[in-house]
């Protein structure tokens, strides 16, 4: 006789376990300093675009 949903429960438990194992890991393989530098550059570009848009909006 089979045990019903035992396979489904084991699958759900394993999926949760795998999700917990990979939760905090990053896939970009950057150091903290590299990540900070990359993020800072992106924010500078974003701020520059915003300032240009504001300047273009006020000069019309």
Swiss-Prot record:
Compositionally biased tracts (Basic and acidic residues): 1-53
Start and end residues of each stretch annotated as Disordered: 1-60
Annotated GO CC locations: cytosol
Superkingdom, natural source: Eukaryota
Family designation: Belongs to the SERF family.
Protein name: Putative SERF-like protein
């Amino acid at each position: 006789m089979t045990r019903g949903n035992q396979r489904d429960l084991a699958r759900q438990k394993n999926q949760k376990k795998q999700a917990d194992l990979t939760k905090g890991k990053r896939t970009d393989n950057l150091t903290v300093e590299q990540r900070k530098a990359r993020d800072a550059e992106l924010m500078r570009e974003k701020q520059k675009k915003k300032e240009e848009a504001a300047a273009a909006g006020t000069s019309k």
